[in-house]
Amino acid sequence: MRATILSLLMLVVAGSSGSPRTMAQTAKSGQDTVLKAAEITPALFPDKVFFRGKTAAAQLRNAGGVKFADGMYFLAALVDNSGYSTAIKEKYQAYILSEVALEIGGTKLPAGAYGIGWLKDGKFVVMDLGAHDIFSIDSRHDGGMRHAVPLQVVAGATPGSYVLYSGRECVDVKRAN
């Protein structure tokens, strides 16, 4: 009986090891998983987000994030900011949803929802939902990025570190202690 159960279990495990995409989507115990745009659905990130008294469509085709080993999420997506004033459009290009506190470029950000943007002067800005600046930091230009996309999150150089990109402009992100 025990041998039969073990054989069935091994068959199920071998049959589920499937494609690299399936394996990439499944976090192993104790590991974080970087999420690509195709993995961020309206069940995780709403189609529309609230910011400065209006709602804007989230561009889930331009999204990225991290599912942490404990099941908590950090997600980011570009937004359609066409209904906002020029002053807000200059700063508000994307939206962050995070269930955990983050460190962005060394600055701590509590869990929550925020508007973000990359400014022409090389700064990255984080705003509360009322469009008030919380902080701004220097972003960096990654000329070595081979295939720049409008927004993505990639694994950083060390475990638990990530890079949030808008094209080739980026900031370092990690879960805060």
Task: Name each model feature, range by range.
Residues 1-4:
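Positively charged n-region of N-terminal signal peptides that target proteins for export
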Residues 7-16:
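Bacterial N-terminal signal peptides
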Residues 81-129:
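Mid-length scaffold segments of soluble, non-membrane domains
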Residues 23-86, 135-177:
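Primarily secretory-pathway and cell-envelope proteins
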Residues 130-134:
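Structural secondary-structure boundary motif
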